[in-house]
Amino acid sequence: MELRQIRSFLSIAETLHFGRTAELIHLSQPALSLQIRALEEEVGARLFERNRRKTSLTAAGVAFRDDAAAALSQLEQAIRRARLAANGKLGQLRIGFVSTVGSEIVPNIVRQFRKSNPEVEFSLRNILTAEQVQMLESGSLDVGFLRMPVGEDSALDVVTVHREPFVLVVPSSHKLAKRKRVRLREVAGQDFVMYERTYAPGFHDLMYGIFRDARIAPNVSQTAVEIPMLISLVASGMGITIAPLSVVKHSAASVVACNILDRIPMSEIGMAVRKGTRAPVVDNFRSFALKTLGRARNSLPADRS
């Protein structure tokens, strides 16, 4: 039994006219009659009564019409969904992100992606970098937005999607709070609150590398697993820290960000997926995100600092 036979049958069942149906589906009337005859042979019953004056459905034809219409609708839906899935426009995306990009970068991309891919379902989770790496490698996460750098021996394909400067973060009552720019040597010997290495080793080592290059050994009074918590610790007077500028901008804590005059690396967010064969929906989202974030970067004004 072929789909074209069922479609032809349903069209005749609606028009009750072989000639009119043949015109509608752009098929010769003899060819249409052959399709229906083959369908009746497969069903094992006559579906139409025909004479010179009219065409009508038999009892078998009425029963077949109702079920065939429902079956055809389901099959056409299955075909449509299969094509969407093959083109990366259907499926579920499990996305992880570090807290500092969860409120801005990820929601914007997801919202824009859903406009042209409404049948993709999302599961969004705030996950620390080290756990994201493990989940991506095990296949329990599809896309991760994490802190760079990630180890070169990783089984992940990582692309930098966001860059911003590090700033020195001090309490609003600190002696440097009124300074717009500082050199790191000016804070040598002061207490620092720092990021724990376990949860983002590459990012932790990057921060300590900044101090090492400035020939400073920070006196660490407290550690935290998330950067927003570091900012809160700074506000409470536990110490000072360095952090990405956007974290301070989005914080309500009573802290001040001072630009760092030393030549230091930028803070980077990477978008990570597993290397190798991936679900089409993952590749579709990744390509869309790279294009979208690329346009956003190109539209930003030049940094004049």
Residue ranges and their predicted role:
Residues L90-D153, A224:
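Central regulatory/effector-binding core of bacterial HTH transcription factors
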Residues R147, K180, Q190-A214, A279-S287, ...:
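Secondary-structure junction motif
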